[in-house]
Amino acid sequence: MNVLSCSINTLKGLYDISGVEVGQHFYWKIGGFQVHGQVLITSWVVIAILLGSATIAVRNPQTIPTGGQNFFEYVLEFIRDVSKTQIGEEYGPWVPFIGTMFLFIFVSNWSGALLPWKIIQLPHGELAAPTNDINTTVALALLTSVAYFYAGLTKKGLGYFGKYIQPTPILLPINILEDFTKPLSLSFRLFGDILADELVVVVLVSLVPSVVPIPVMFLGLFTSGIQALIFATLAAAYIGESMEGHH
């Protein structure tokens, strides 16, 4: 009976944890719309971190970069390499977009593990990484969709839509469906990974001593960085594909 009671209490604890993480939200009313306030708060914090870091790093640029300037130039070079590899020689105008996506997702993912969101109490719900919310990841995926449609139409005009009947008109439904599955796969992959990572850490912290979840937290940081890179790489690949033709 003691074992059964312990098991029931453990399952109840897991249910309570998952309910707090997933089901409750702090809503704001903005212009007649209901938005998730905690997502806006954490997104603003992430944006402030990015803008503040960039401002501090480049406020006094040197010919021979050092410190923060050197780090940001390395990050910029890395983003340029990713963009050039996926888009091709016309990658230049898309570096800011790909870089913004990568940095926002990277810092958002890491903020869920490194920033003490729990100390800020809300009337409902709790603060977590912005990418922990499906609304954020869907918005990022839709922005990517708009970007690759814009890239294709700018490069080819209305001839861009010819890709839907290549290599044969029979594939028209499948080619149309592909454009719907791209944002779905981008958004749910990122959302699922970040949500699962945070839930696993919370469950382990509640069940075992604090030292045990640390390796899982480090693994979560690694996978969070990989997810940011995957999202940015796929976004660049979709843009490059729309400019070059259907593959």
Swiss-Prot record:
Main localization of the protein described in the UniProt heading: plastid
Domain of life: Eukaryota
Coiled-coil region: none
Role description: Key component of the proton channel; it plays a direct role in the translocation of protons across the membrane.
Keywords for the protein's UniProt record, in alphabetical order: ATP synthesis, CF(0), Chloroplast, Hydrogen ion transport, Ion transport, Membrane, Plastid, Thylakoid, Transmembrane, Transmembrane helix, Transport
InterPro entries per record: ATP_syn_F0_a_bact/chloroplast (IPR045082), ATP_synth_F0_asu (IPR000568), F0_ATP_A_sf (IPR035908)
Encoding gene per record: atpI
HAMAP family, sorted: ATP_synth_a_bact
Transmembrane segments: 38-58, 95-115, 134-154, 199-219, 220-240
GO MF annotation terms: proton-transporting ATP synthase activity, rotational mechanism
Subunit structure: F-type ATPases have 2 components, CF(1) - the catalytic core - and CF(0) - the membrane proton channel. CF(1) has five subunits: alpha(3), beta(3), gamma(1), delta(1), epsilon(1). CF(0) has four main subunits: a, b, b' and c.
Record CDD domains: ATP-synt_Fo_a_6 (cd00310)
Thylakoid found in the keyword field: yes
Protein name in the entry: ATP synthase subunit a, chloroplastic
Localization (cell): Plastid, Chloroplast thylakoid membrane
Family: Belongs to the ATPase A chain family.
A single Gene Ontology CC term: chloroplast thylakoid membrane
The UniProt record lists the keyword Transferase: no
Membrane disposition: Multi-pass membrane protein
